[in-house]
Curated annotation (Swiss-Prot):
Chorionic epithelium (trophectoderm) and placental cotyledons. On the 2D-gel the determined pI of this protein is: 6.9, its MW is: 60 kDa. Keywords: Aspartyl protease, Glycoprotein, Hydrolase, Protease, Secreted. It is an enzyme of class 3 (hydrolase). This is Pregnancy-associated glycoprotein 60H. Its EC number is 3.4.23.-.
């Protein structure tokens, strides 16, 4: 999900927290 970072940066961060 690299393109998601540009479309939804905030969402990407939340996904990262869930991944951790």
């Amino acid at each position: 999900r690299g393109s998601n970072l540009t479309t939804h940066p905030l969402r990407n961060i939340k996904d990262l927290v869930v991944y951790m």
